[in-house]
Amino acid sequence: MKITILGSGGGEGYPAAFCGCDHCNAARAAGGKSIRTLSQTLINGDLLIDFPCDTRVHALNSGVNLGDVANLLITHTHSDHFAPEELSCRGGCFAHNIKEPTLTIRGSSDVKRFFDTVFSVYNLSGKVAEGILFDEFAAYESCRVGNYTVTALPARHAQGLIPYNYVITDGEKTLLYLLDTGYPTEEVLAFIRENVAHADAVIMDATMGVAPVGAYYGHMGFEENKILKEYLITSGVADASTVFVADHITHNKAETHDKIEEIFDGTGILVAYDGMVLEI
């Protein structure tokens, strides 16, 4: 399984567009891996996770033709993860010779309502609308998504909404995708223990950076990443071969990429960056 982290930043990106804090100024000066666009991940070139307004930039930077993608998973409706109006260019006079004529979007009932609301105001042209389907599924439900079996996990994030994390397997390799979320609930951890034989990769929310454990219910920080890694190994879900990645990084609680790597040095946790490729 090839995992490409197209965007590794939190909700405002890093540096944030309007921000003059020391961290953002340092990131502008450092460039490279310290520049983080909005969160998005691509699996094997055919399964996309989330669809922020930075999607076109991600396609350009990675050399990906999004017309080759048949399936899209949405974690939740916050704008840094789902900007459905960007789909208006998928077809008609805007896109030709699309390899995959139909894009199937999957997410919670909350995501479906948001999708319908946006396009009740921002109409899709007939040709574009014909090529976009939505398949709603419930928490803990598993469904076949192209070459994968995907299971939705309730995320600790966005009170009043229905956010998901995902277990994604191709039958040989399994990814635990834990963005955006606080430390998983015992119910979710129990489900993972009972249903995930082995996680080959775990991508973890690290939004809270150096903040103390439990600083915010809806995001994890670096210490919680370390705790979760040890928990998954102790519970038998992960082992020394599992790739752990801290992702969804913001300027409020984390410095430049090299400084974050220093924090995780010796822990076996990698720090995500835009364009990062994992082969598991």
Model-derived segments and spans:
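Active-site metal-binding motif and surrounding structural segment of the metallo-beta-lactamase
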Residues: 46, 52-104, 200-202
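Cap/insert and terminal regions of metallo-dependent hydrolase folds
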Residues: 182-276
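Short, charged/polar "capping" segments at the starts of alpha-helices
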Residues: 111-116, 252-257, 279
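Metallo-beta-lactamase
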Residues: 98-163, 170-171, 270-272
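Alpha-helix termini
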Residues: 63-64, 90-99, 121-127, 230-240
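Core dinuclear metal-dependent hydrolase active-site scaffold
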Residues: 1-64, 134-194, 277-280
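Histidine-centered divalent metal-coordination motifs
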Residues: 71, 75-81, 157, 219, ...
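Short, well-ordered amphipathic alpha-helices
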Residues: 56-60, 85-92, 115-120, 223-233
